[in-house]
Amino acid sequence: MSVALSIPLLSLPEDMREALAAAAGPVYSGDRFRRQLLQTPCSGVACIGDYVSQACIATLSTAWTGPLILVVDGKTRRESWRDMVVPQGFRVHRVRSPPGSLSLEAYTTICKLMEEYGRHVVFVEGEEDLIALAALDCGIDWTVVYGLPGVGGVVVHRCLRKPGLENSSVLAFKPGTGVHHQSSP
């Protein structure tokens, strides 16, 4: 039996889908991607997506001692993927964020974790794609990494951008509520 819960969220306007599909920064793959991660000039790294998070762990596990956030939903290209093994020393968090939306729970969790400067894995029930916008919005001194399926990893060194020159795409989202179905015990 499942219980329907109403959760506050921000919905992606249809006319913004194409604009947000474009990379927010340079796209890298292979060794160039790994070098960008290893040479980050920022104080923390946030990796959004299952495949990208696995690549971040493989690249940064022994070489990076700074803050690290991994955000996963158990899917790649909307298909089930392997389970994320939580690395030792990481705190686990769970949020809900329906597809095509950014829940306020997910937004505030990411922003709060970026202020804490720890090591975290965030499991998303729903879809993690738009959580990259929360990381870009809140992670002023962070490197934000997310995947473009079939292309590579987008690496945005937010610490190198001048503050105040960019408007958050999140401001254009439509506030509302969404129904989330949760299994009852």
From Swiss-Prot:
Top-level class of the enzyme under EC nomenclature: transferase
Keyword annotations from UniProtKB, A to Z: Coenzyme A biosynthesis, GTP-binding, Kinase, Nucleotide-binding, Transferase
Binding site for GTP: 50, 52, 73, 75, 128
Pathway: Cofactor biosynthesis; coenzyme A biosynthesis
Alphabetized InterPro entries for the sequence: GTP-dep_dephospho-CoA_kin
Catalytic activity entry: 3'-dephospho-CoA + GTP = GDP + CoA + H(+)
Entry superkingdom: Archaea
GO terms of biological process kind: coenzyme A biosynthetic process
GO molecular function ontology, one term from the record: kinase activity
Its biological purpose: Catalyzes the GTP-dependent phosphorylation of the 3'-hydroxyl group of dephosphocoenzyme A to form coenzyme A (CoA).
Similarity comment text for this entry: Belongs to the GTP-dependent DPCK family.
Descriptive protein name: GTP-dependent dephospho-CoA kinase
Organism lineage string: Archaea, Thermoproteota, Thermoprotei, Desulfurococcales, Desulfurococcaceae
